[in-house]
């Protein structure tokens, strides 16, 4: 919670995602699953608010992650980490190394959500271990020296946790999950959720749409942000009209399409009628 004293100042880098969500605007997020330093600069240049760093399905060393988080700070863009596990110390180490927030996979109940908040927020909201001399605290250069500055308040206010809704159980418990203090929003993992919904008895084609609608309603009721993985711009526009503000589009996997197009262009340029490709 912010102190009543208006002279309180913040020394921590402010989250662009949270600034957008708090003002009711869309947080523009692209994704990255490989160690591509140049991609950070490109994302920041093209006005993305955050990079979704996928460590659930991709492997990186700790030093590679630290390097990318440092580049995000230098480029003034948030890094939203999707972690490979919810192990307590691992989570807050990402924050100390500069992550702006988390996208937590398979947050299927309120207990999971509370456990993550416990690990990533300082008291009284959580039980995160205190260091204060990582990248997030400017390595201690200023964080402990300015009057009315408070690293723990900064960290609680300028970092976020978004829970992924990826199972039918999570949909059935969505109100309990989104109501957890310290959960800033929900994000529907359309692939995993759609897979599981389709395996149920009496499944219908509209089950995923109904689940997304349920997430939207619960998030709106509790005053939290939400979003959903989208496979088309039409879906993004639809979710935006439904109130989605966590918007993801674009990723390093898009390089496949770039190379495909370049290959076709090369074929067109190099072939002639007498020597078809």
Where is each model-derived feature located?
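Active-site mouth loops of central-metabolism enzymes
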Residues: 21-37, 82-84, 159-172, 225-230
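Conserved anion-binding
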Residues: 89, 101-180
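Alpha-helix-loop-beta-strand connector modules within alpha/beta enzyme cores
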Residues: 62-88, 92-96, 120-125, 156, ...
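Conserved N-terminal beta1-alpha1 strand-loop-helix module at the mouth
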Residues: 8-79, 85-86, 118, 179-183
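Conserved, mostly hydrophobic/aromatic
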Residues: 30, 54, 102, 116, ...
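Glycine-rich phosphate-binding active-site loops on the catalytic face of alpha/beta enzymes
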Residues: 101-115, 186-197, 245-262
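C-terminal helical cap(s) of enzyme catalytic domains, especially alpha/beta-barrels
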Residues: 68, 110-126, 255-276
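N-terminal amphipathic alpha-helix/helix-capping segment at the start of soluble metabolic enzymes
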Residues: 8-31, 142-157, 213-214, 221
């Amino acid at each position: 919670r912010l102190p009543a004293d208006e002279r309180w100042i913040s020394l921590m880098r402010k989250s662009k995602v949270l600034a957008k969500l708090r003002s009711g605007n869309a947080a523009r997020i692209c994704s990255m699953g490989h160690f591509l330093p140049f991609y950070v600069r490109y994302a920041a240049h093209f006005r993305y608010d955050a990079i979704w760093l996928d460590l659930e399905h991709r492997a990186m060393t700790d030093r590679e992650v630290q390097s990318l988080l440092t580049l995000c700070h230098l480029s003034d863009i948030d890094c939203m980490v999707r972690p490979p596990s919810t192990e307590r110390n691992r989570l807050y180490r990402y924050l100390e190394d500069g992550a702006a927030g988390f996208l937590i996979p398979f947050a299927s109940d309120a207990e999971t959500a509370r456990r993550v908040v416990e690990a990533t927020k300082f008291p009284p909201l959580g039980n995160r271990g205190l260091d204060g001399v990582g990248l997030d605290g400017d390595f201690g250069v200023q964080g402990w020296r300015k009057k009315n500055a408070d690293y723990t308040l900064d960290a609680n206010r300028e970092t976020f946790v978004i829970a992924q809704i990826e199972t039918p159980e999570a949909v059935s418990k969505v109100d309990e999950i989104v109501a957890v203090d310290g959960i800033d929003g929900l994000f529907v993992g359309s692939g995993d959720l759609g897979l599981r919904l389709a395996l149920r008895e009496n499944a219908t084609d509209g089950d995923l749409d109904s689940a997304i609608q349920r997430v939207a309603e619960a998030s709106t009721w509790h005053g939290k942000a939400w979003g959903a993985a989208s496979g088309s711009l039409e879906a993004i526009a639809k979710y935006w009209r439904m109130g989605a503000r966590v918007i993801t589009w674009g990723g390093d996997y898009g390089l496949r399409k770039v190379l495909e197009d370049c290959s076709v262009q090369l074929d067109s340029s190099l072939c002639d009628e007498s020597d078809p490709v």
